[in-house]
């Protein structure tokens, strides 16, 4: 299954707020159904499926990508669900988004693909690059790069930067000071339902 490229409003109406996909918020379709048909039962499969779709849509992943991360998380020591979230949060495209250098994760992915971003002085054009503590994230020297990201910061850096990241607005430089903790993740998600959804596939 490929990455969704349709109307974003349609997704958030069905799944709820997805800050990585869009800053827009709407009343979710699920809430409307719950109130109008209180006796209608929703299957456990559908609940797990929608939670998985929420994770995919927020981080902008294809099904095969999310399944790959799920397999890595299952092999690691610790809580599979929390490790999965940590892997997704430490992606470069998401880190750019959380630093406020882009209003959305798709926007951050475009910055990386167009070679506007460097890690430790080396240009990185892979959105899935795994950021680690000690990484320094800078903007390319091109005037266009600095203009785009400065504009984004002035317009969209309104959310609190999570504690595992630091941003120097004078140098337009971000840094990763530690791995992200569960409480700093800005998506409302029940990761255990996602783990249960994939339990027979990994």
From Swiss-Prot:
Q: Which residues cross the membrane?
A: none
Matches recorded under SMART domains: Ribosomal_S4, S4
Organism domain of life: Eukaryota
Which cysteines in this chain are paired by disulphide bridges?
none
* InterPro entries, A to Z: Ribosomal_uS4, Ribosomal_uS4_bac-type, Ribosomal_uS4_CS, Ribosomal_uS4_N, S4_RNA-bd, S4_RNA-bd_sf
Pfam families this protein is in?
Ribosomal_S4, S4
The principal location of this protein is plastid
Has the keyword rRNA-binding been applied to this entry?
Answer: yes
The entry lists its GO molecular-function terms as:
rRNA binding; structural constituent of ribosome
Assembly and oligomerization: Part of the 30S ribosomal subunit. Contacts protein S5. The interaction surface between S4 and S5 is involved in control of translational fidelity.
Similarity section: Belongs to the universal ribosomal protein uS4 family.
Matching entries from NCBIfam families are given as: PRK05327.1 (NF003717), rpsD_bact (TIGR01017)
Q: What is the recorded name of this protein?
A: Small ribosomal subunit protein uS4c
